[in-house]
């Protein structure tokens, strides 16, 4: 059965009316909480088959998409288009969190992915997918990204004391900024304001974004000449992943969490993932697995030659003050 929980009430396939959460049947349940949404999903079963687990994964994906769409709708209807984001930048409502990325062999931190968050004074935490899509639709992704750069530069002295020399700073770049006239100058300015010779900036670009731009190869060559590295983000979720590997010079493949989440299930994921890893090695590209949440996933990925791991098994994204005190709680690398 399925139950959707909102505070103390639940809508369940086991009843035609709203029931109290305490009245739900007591049995084995898988629970998924949609982040930043006051909604909990429970999937009930006495035993879980591989087909049921795949169904649960698919159902959770649908719920996640629906929640993101709902947040985007609320954001676009309740807020004055454009004005709120610019006002939020001016009032300091955006902040940065850092998620560690570790070397798969030694389990030592080698860098971070930098992620932006928005705490609205009345709506609370707004999901990143919602406000980023909103900013792209309103042609505000460039000022939003420049504000992200400012926040990173502000944090850089502390990051320099925490991260080793050569540490990777993974930054997501939207297509609206990637092909803006100011992009090259923006990147040069950002690089010049970072502590010299300490960080290696990795620009994370989804394959869906590259599909629309024939000039991508020339731009990527320029970025490499300027000292930046490039990662294909969410690899395997777009339309022409293998074509990009053939035509563009990349440094990293970030394996989408959808592949990682199905490790251990009886699906075709393992052979597909094996093929991706083999291809990356032949192309001299490093691999980063996103969404690593369990020791079993980490073990499988390490045994199959993934270079870097990122996910809740290592750490959730953290604000700067929490990140500077963070100590990894991971097993010895030999385990």
Model-predicted regions and their roles:
Residues 1-14:
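Solvent-exposed, extracytoplasmic
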Residues 11, 15-54:
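Extracellular/periplasmic juxtamembrane segments that couple receptor/chemosensory ectodomains to their
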Residues 41-54, 175-179, 202-212, 228-229, ...:
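EAL-family c-di-GMP phosphodiesterase catalytic domain
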Residues 50-80:
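Cytoplasm-proximal transmembrane signaling helix
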Residues 78, 99, 124-128, 137, ...:
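Catalytic-site-adjacent helices and loops of nucleotide signaling machinery
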Residues 80-133, 315-318:
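Active-site core of bacterial EAL-family cyclic-dinucleotide phosphodiesterase domains
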Residues 120-123, 149-153, 234, 311:
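Short acidic-capped amphipathic helix/loop micro-motif used as an active-site/signal-coupling element
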Residues 140-215, 291:
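Catalytic core of bacterial c-di-GMP phosphodiesterases, primarily the EAL and HD-GYP domains
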